[in-house]
């Protein structure tokens, strides 16, 4: 019983430390409109081109784009830190 509890605690701490795997930058502040006034595609949602995606408010720290998601067949919008190797 004790090893099972330890394993569950380890898994819980791992999820808390590493975060949810499908975040895609949705919690990073971003603009909800494109320059032409149309709504943009939010991070984590399907897209076909980068110009459809919402841009980050802090463009110097964060980058955005439309790319293929890991374990998903379609392209999605993402926002991530420019210095992150996970982007």
From Swiss-Prot:
Transmembrane segments: none annotated. Residues 1-19 form the signal peptide. It is found in: Secreted. Probable neurotoxin with ion channel impairing activity. Belongs to the neurotoxin 27 (Jztx-72) family. ICK-41 subfamily. Keywords: Disulfide bond, Ion channel impairing toxin, Knottin, Neurotoxin, Secreted, Signal, Toxin. The presence of a 'disulfide through disulfide knot' structurally defines this protein as a knottin. One of its GO terms (cellular component) is extracellular region. Expressed by the venom gland. Pfam families: Cys_Knot_tox. InterPro entries: Cys_Knot_tox. GO terms for molecular function: ion channel regulator activity; toxin activity. This is Toxin ICK-42. The keyword Disulfide bond applies. The keyword Signal applies. It comes from Trittame loki.
């Amino acid at each position: 019983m004790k090893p099972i509890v330890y394993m569950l605690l380890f898994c819980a701490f791992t999820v808390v430390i590493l975060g949810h795997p499908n975040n895609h930058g949705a919690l990073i502040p971003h603009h909800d409109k494109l320059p032409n006034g149309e709504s943009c595609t939010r991070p984590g949602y399907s897209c076909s081109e980068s110009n459809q995606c919402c841009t980050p408010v802090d463009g110097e720290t964060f980058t955005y784009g439309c790319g293929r998601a890991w374990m998903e067949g379609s392209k999605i919008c993402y926002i991530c830190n420019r210095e992150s190797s996970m982007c």
